[in-house]
Amino acid sequence: MKKTIIVFIILAFMLNCKNKSNDAEPNNDLDEKSQAKSNLVDEDRIEFSKATPLEKLVSRLNLNNTEKETLTFLTNLLKEKLVDPNIGLHFKNSGGDESKIEESVQKFLSELKEDEIKDLLAKIKENKDKKEKDPEELNTYKSILASGFDGIFNQADSKTTLNKLKDTI
């Protein structure tokens, strides 16, 4: 009797596993177009949920590709300078966490008007383009820019930091 029960449990388990693996396969009854459409919906949901607050802010702003590239340059240089011991004291308040940098940049930008953001990005791009010919000048500019952004990691007022940046860059 015990053997019969054990064999029955094993068979039930094997059937259950087989049914689960069949569910994982795409339904052959559906045409390819509807399967592709279904996959797109799932991918969009996943991507939307992965968007950072900075990405969400950028999507709400009317930034052109050049401005988006400049913002990416700025964010990446701040992440790069995070490990530099010569950067400002408050910059280290991020605790070495790169996500804190994006969070701080997002907070800083969200307190500014769209035209102020565009002006700032245009000025950064203009100076970056001038300095790009000489790697040493570009690195110096990156350090100056990172030092100028030191105030956003001290929870300083965005307008104050913006005015300081205008003088710096």
Swiss-Prot record:
It is found in: Cell outer membrane. Keywords: Cell outer membrane, Membrane, Plasmid. One of its GO terms (cellular component) is membrane. The keyword Membrane applies. It comes from the Bacteria. Its main location: membrane. The keyword Nucleotide-binding does not apply. It is a peripheral membrane protein. This is Putative outer membrane protein BBA03. It comes from Borreliella burgdorferi (strain ATCC 35210 / DSM 4680 / CIP 102532 / B31).
